[in-house]
Amino acid sequence: MFRWGIIFLIIALIAAALGFGGLAGTAAWAAKVVFVVGIILFLISLFTGRKRL
C-alpha cells in the first residue's frame, strides 16, 4: 500500500515539474487516498491482532 502511495507521489512530483497541473493533482490525490487506506488497514490490524485458533 505504501509503495503505491510513494509511486503516485513521485509521479505527481514529476508531473508538477513538467507543468501538467491536472495530472499532478490527480496523482497527488491518488497518493493521499492510498496512504489513508494503508493507515486505516494498519490500525485495524494493530487493534485486532492475530487470532489464534
From Swiss-Prot:
Coiled coil start-end: none
What GO cellular-component annotations does this UniProt entry give? plasma membrane
> Which of UniProt's keywords are assigned here?
Cell membrane, Membrane, Transmembrane, Transmembrane helix
Tell me which species this is from.
Answer: Yersinia pseudotuberculosis serotype O:1b (strain IP 31758)
Pfam families in the record: DUF1328 (PF07043)
Name the residues that span the membrane: 4-24, 27-47
Family membership: Belongs to the UPF0391 family.
How would you describe this protein's topology in the membrane?
Multi-pass membrane protein
Q: Which domain of life is it from?
A: Bacteria
Task: Give the location in the cell.
Answer: Cell membrane
Name of the protein? UPF0391 membrane protein YpsIP31758_3502
Q: Which HAMAP family match?
A: UPF0391
